[in-house]
Amino acid sequence: MGVNEEGYNELTLSNIKDKEQIYLKAQKDYDELVQHNFTQRILNDKDSIVDGIYNERIKKVHTQTIDLAKNVNVGGEYLTNVGLSKDTIVGLSNTLNVGVDNKVRVAKNSHEFVGENKDIEIGANQ
């Protein structure tokens, strides 16, 4: 770092009992290159905040296992684009709540199978 430059990088190691911590600060950019495997295990919680744009690209397979629950909150639009096919399997019930309009577009064939009962309620025009 030059004499007149402000800002700094920091690496701190603390071994104080019950306050053990490794702290890393990059004043500007932080890059990692792992030429083989990268394994991470967190025995408690993980929190991340990204103040800008978050991009992630996975060139092969992405597998995610969640043992309890998953909540996703999106403040604006949400788009899912699948190149080939998409299957959704729900063990018990599935509910879709739409605030205004719901549209389904099928380019060719559509099939619906109901094992027992089907009820349709229309509040106004048919």
Give the location of each predicted region:
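Structural signature for extended repeat/solenoid scaffolds and their inter-repeat hinge/linker regions
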Residues: 1-126
